[in-house]
UniProtKB/Swiss-Prot annotation:
Belongs to the CinA family. It comes from the Bacteria. This is Putative competence-damage inducible protein. SUPFAM superfamilies: CinA-like (SSF142433), Molybdenum cofactor biosynthesis proteins (SSF53218). PANTHER family: NICOTINAMIDE-NUCLEOTIDE AMIDOHYDROLASE PNCC, NMN AMIDOHYDROLASE-LIKE PROTEIN YFAY. SMART domains: MoCF_biosynth. The lineage of its organism: Bacteria, Bacillati, Bacillota, Bacillota incertae sedis, Caldicellulosiruptorales. NCBIfam families: cinA_nterm, molyb_syn, PncC_domain, PRK00549.1. Gene3D superfamilies: 3.30.70.2860, CinA-like (3.90.950.20), MoaB/Mog-like domain (3.40.980.10). It holds the Pfam family CinA.
Length: 411
């Protein structure tokens, strides 16, 4: 069966809120094996919403609505669906009692306006809202299905999981199983070129590349009724890809680079220290956002000025004078200084020009050097990033974490 998502709310069209509901529902429908070919966003207008319903029903079997189930006059999803299907809205005492109980539990009397939410489409399946006042509904009409869900994600998602997932599972025997490989240090076009035979000659599993900020994701997907069979197919394809590009793969699915780095440090019993200039503490922030980071993160230095680099890290004034703060030499001395003045096994450093000012003819905005030091090894790497100040800082911090990842592998 084919589904369509219809998100209702003028605030979505005005860009006042981000439509996370559509993203969530798209992912869940895919995992359930329900085909989704269209998404529609409609403002709070009865006639336009009915028009969207008319178009959707000509091409889809299941319509999933989010939003427009509130108590105010601009909440018109129930009204539009019922008018289109020729259904009446009937006051349901049980629903009304639950809404009144919701307010009583919070020590306030239910506003009269909320009584509107107790009117339900005749013949519908009522979906209880355990996190708000707007119930959801499933309406079956002449082989078509309309599923009405509240707009707030913290209400919509639990309702979908508890009631809609079991309902939809009966329509698809097969599910889509996916695995995402996460790459860093290589571009989308380079990945496609090196995997061209796999990508273009492969139908099961399917492969799809997605460029993300400073990294690339490759989704491997297969549609199967047996999870074990699906896992075997995904495993085999992952092995083929790792044989070709394994050095660039840092994680899978929802893993972040910092999570992977912290886990690797834990596994090897290592500690890290960080000396930052152009990234201004962003690397330390990323690492310490990971639970358990206290076991592997020793300390961080934010040495923005040349004076701080000299005083805190022992960078040579002569090196600064001869090569400048943004240089291989300073990056290496920063990393060595962070290692020497800490209890770490590995130290990394950043120095660069985040812009928009500070560039010279030989040192443009986006030039960053990342240093790394262990007791037996010191090196630095040059990167050239583009974008505004925040984008360059983010790119540099990810590149530094990747340098750290590779150093841990070879430690």
């Amino acid at each position: 069966m084919m589904a369509e998502i219809i998100c209702v709310g003028t605030e979505l069209l005005l860009g006042q809120i981000v439509n996370t509901n559509a993203q969530y529902l798209s992912q869940r429908l895919a995992s359930l094996g329900i085909d989704l070919y269209f998404q529609t966003t409609v403002g709070d207008n009865l006639n336009r919403l009915k028009g969207a319903i008319d178009i959707a029903l000509k091409r889809s079997d299941i319509l999933i609505f989010t939003g427009g189930l509130g108590p105010t006059s601009d909440d018109i999803t129930k009204e539009a669906v019922c008018e289109y299907f020729g259904k009446k809205l009937i006051l349901n005492q049980e629903v009304l009692d639950k809404i009144e109980k919701y307010f009583k539990h919070r020590g306030v009397k239910m506003p009269e306006i909320n009584k509107k939410q107790a009117y339900v489409p005749e013949g519908s399946i009522i979906l209880e809202n355990r996190h708000g006042t707007a119930p959801g509904f499933i309406i079956e009409n002449d082989g078509k299905i309309a599923i009405l869900l509240p707009g707030p994600p913290f209400e919509m998602q639990p309702m979908f999981e508890e009631y809609v997932v079991p309902y939809l599972e009966k329509f698809s025997k097969e599910k889509i199983y996916s695995r995402v490989l996460k790459f860093i240090g290589i571009g989308e076009s380079s990945i496609e070129e090196r995997l061209s035979e796999l990508i273009h000659n492969q139908s099961d599993p399917s492969l799809a590349l997605y460029a993300k900020p400073f990294e690339v994701e490759l989704r491997i997907s297969t549609k199967k009724s047996d999870e074990a069979v699906a896992k075997d197919i995904l495993d085999q394809m992952e092995s083929k890809i790792r044989a070709l590009l394994g050095e660039y793969i840092y994680g899978i699915d929802n893993q972040t680079l910092e999570e992977v780095v912290v886990e690797m440090l834990m596994q090897k019993g290592l500690k890290v220290s960080v000396a930052e200039s152009c990234t201004g503490g962003l690397i330390c922030n990323k690492i310490t956002n990971v639970p358990g980071a206290s076991n592997v993160f020793d300390r961080g230095f934010i040495t923005y000025s040349n004076e701080a680099k000299v005083k805190e890290l022992g960078v040579s004034e002569e090196t600064l004078k001869n090569f400048g703060a943004v240089s291989h030499e300073v990056a290496k001395q920063m990393a060595q200084g962070a290692l020497k003045t800490s209890l770490a096994d590995i130290a990394i450093s950043t120095t660069g020009i985040a812009g928009p000012t500070g560039a010279t003819e030989t040192k443009p905005v986006g030039l960053v050097y990342i240093g790394v030091a262990t007791k037996n090894y010191v090196d630095s790497f040059e990167f050239r990033f583009s974008g505004d100040r925040l984008r360059i800082k983010e790119a540099a911090s990810k590149a530094a974490l990747d340098v750290l990842r590779k150093t841990i592998i070879n430690y």
